[in-house]
């Protein structure tokens, strides 16, 4: 009998550490010996003091991997001492699980089981979000954690009905809280613009932001990055099939011209689907390339 097909998931946990690489290495080491785990990418950002690890594994191993990473992060990262530009709740800030060959329902079940164990075994408060939300308002991450509600504010808010965790205690330790959920593929994409004026950055970010009347399925924030002496427009594309990267870049360029600034550099945080890149290529090259014209795709499929 052939082996049962493994249901593959991707995980993209975000950790509140971007300055001490040894701590991130220990978090990665905690899952290296788990069967089927493949580390795909690491993005470390000292300004945001945040790291994003991308890995895949069979869905039957995601809970083991999640517990190991969250436990290790809790032992290494003290939120009382943490500072950084990016909003954050805890040592492991957010732990999304994305279906690859598994189904979304599979990922929802796995994420809730992970959340339950993190709460009961690690004694860390857990909020379920996106497709795994157990409270409707928590489907959107911004309704849980945002620039106005972070680790410091959560210390008191966690005792209220609105911020009662889905799992775990209603009090915070030095590891803070973790947000866990199943979600579709997301593209984290940043653009630096030629100004140090954060007010201009915020206006441009608002013009692009979906909830402010900009591009659908686009979430934006503006940060001043001291190391670059520039403003960064930080973006999450929650559905790249509805909101293409080229549309974002073109609209941002138009908005920049209103303030006599221009886009300087783009950066990708984590990984992106091949189809999203092909979409950008086809727009600018006026072509109709499909993935079966990509050499590496033909070789490895």
Swiss-Prot record:
Pathway assigned in UniProt: Amino-acid degradation; L-histidine degradation into L-glutamate; L-glutamate from N-formimidoyl-L-glutamate (transferase route): step 1/1; One-carbon metabolism; tetrahydrofolate interconversion
Keyword Cytoplasm included in the entry's annotation: yes
EC number per UniProt: 2.1.2.5, 6.3.3.2
GO biological process: L-histidine catabolic process to glutamate and formamide; L-histidine catabolic process to glutamate and formate; tetrahydrofolate interconversion
Residues annotated as binding folate: 168-176
Family, per entry: Belongs to the formiminotransferase family.
Protein name: Glutamate formimidoyltransferase
């Amino acid at each position: 009998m052939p082996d049962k097909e493994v249901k593959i998931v991707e995980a993209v946990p975000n950790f509140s550490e971007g300055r001490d690489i040894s701590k991130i290495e220990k978090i990665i080491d905690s899952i290296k010996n788990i069967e089927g785990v493949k580390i795909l990418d690491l993005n470390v950002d000292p300004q945001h003091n945040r790291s994003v690890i991308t890995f895949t594994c069979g869905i039957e191993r995601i809970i083991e991997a999640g517990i190991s990473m969250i436990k290790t992060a809790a032992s290494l990262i003290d939120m009382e001492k943490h500072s950084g530009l990016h909003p954050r709740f805890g040592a492991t800030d957010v732990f999304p699980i994305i279906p690859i060959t598994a189904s979304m329902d599979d990922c929802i079940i796995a994420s809730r089981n992970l959340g339950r164990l993190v709460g009961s075994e690690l004694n860390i408060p857990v909020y379920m979000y996106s497709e795994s939300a157990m409270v409707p308002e928590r489907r959107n991450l911004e309704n849980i954690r945002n620039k106005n509600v972070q680790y410091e504010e959560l210390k008191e808010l966690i005792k209220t009905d609105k911020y009662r965790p889905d799992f775990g205690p209603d009090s915070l330790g030095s590891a803070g809280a973790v947000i866990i959920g199943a979600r579709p593929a997301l593209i984290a994409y940043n653009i630096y613009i030629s100004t140090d004026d954060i007010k201009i950055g915020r206006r441009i970010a608002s013009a692009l932001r979906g909830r402010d009347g900009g591009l659908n399925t686009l979430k934006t924030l503006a940060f001043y990055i001291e190391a670059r002496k520039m403003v960064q427009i930080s973006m999450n594309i929650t559905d790249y099939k509805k909101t293409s990267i080229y549309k974002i870049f073109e609209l941002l360029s138009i908005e920049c011209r209103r303030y006599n600034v221009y886009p300087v550099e783009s950066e990708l945080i984590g990984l992106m689907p091949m189809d999203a890149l092909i979409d950008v290529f086809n727009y600018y090259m006026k072509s109709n390339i499909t993935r079966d014209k990509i050499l590496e795709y033909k070789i490895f499929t």
